A protein has these predicted regions:
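Proline- and Ser/Thr-rich low-complexity, intrinsically disordered segments
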Residues: 1-254
Length: 254
């Protein structure tokens, strides 16, 4: 505090709000010399003060941009914490803890981290963009089909895509349960699971494979005898619609 009867002079004056008062406000680093003069006897005294500066900003690193997927529905962002810094993230929606260096997020957006150096109050900011890829693949197990005596196996499914993997269940009755279009030879309900390699998203579809191997009825009729009076006979039984008939040998038949 100023003493009555004394005058005050600070040097240099640069960086001071008033170089001629006892307690000026300083805003620049440097070595300041104070000269105090007694107005009555003209005696002087001097003293110095060193004003240093610490305005080093902390490092703010929100980390690289990332993508949420079905395989990775949550991600950690940011980088390792530095002692003496505080961390504040925004927005906070979808975030595990907005006041740590490396929170976990579940929502796609652009997140900004503000890092404050507790020692000097300096702050820095950085941002990271989180996108999302949860587009499911297409699963097509194909149309329901029926195994028969003439069609004992056939292909199911649809043409595959190199960006997907394929898995059929059950595997029994299939030549390869990891193909997009396996060959089936046994009746069952087959479930196809298609997984997108890039995002891990899955889609399923089913196909019903039935079997019809019921044989038709073959009835050649009762044994008969050709005679002089019965030189020909009708053999067999009445035809059934949908059946075809073949006799061997053909010699002697109309």
């Amino acid at each position: 505090a100023a003493v009555a009867g004394n005058t005050y002079t600070w040097s240099p004056a640069f960086g001071l709000d008033n170089a001629n008062i006892a307690q000026p406000v300083v805003s620049s680093p440097g070595t300041y010399t104070l000269t105090v003069t007694n107005s009555i006897n003209g005696c002087t005294a001097t003293d110095q003060i060193v004003i240093s500066q610490n305005i080093t900003a902390p490092a703010a690193n929100a980390g690289p941009n990332k993508t949420l997927t079905c395989a990775n529905p949550s991600l950690q962002i940011g980088t390792a914490a530095i002692a003496g810094n505080t961390y504040t993230w925004s927005p906070t929606a979808g975030m595990s803890n907005p006041n740590i260096a490396q929170p976990t997020i579940t929502i796609p957006t652009t997140y900004t981290v503000t890092v404050k150096n507790s020692a000097n109050g300096c702050i820095s900011t950085d941002a990271v963009t989180i996108s999302q890829n949860i587009t499911p693949p297409t699963a097509n197990a194909g149309a329901d089909k029926t195994l028969t005596c003439t069609n004992t196996s056939f292909t199911i499914g649809a043409p595959g895509n190199a960006s997907n993997t394929y898995s059929w269940s059950p595997a029994t009755g299939l030549d390869d349960a990891t193909l997009a279009q396996p060959i089936v030879s046994a009746p069952n309900t087959y479930t196809l699971t298609v997984t997108n390699i890039t995002n891990g998203c899955k889609t399923t579809d089913q196909v019903l494979i039935s079997r019809n191997i019921t044989p038709p009825t073959a009835n050649a009729g009762a044994d008969k005898t050709l005679t002089c009076t019965n030189t020909s006979h009708v053999i067999g039984t009445t035809a059934v619609v949908g059946n075809s008939y073949a006799w061997t040998p053909a010699t002697g038949l109309d």
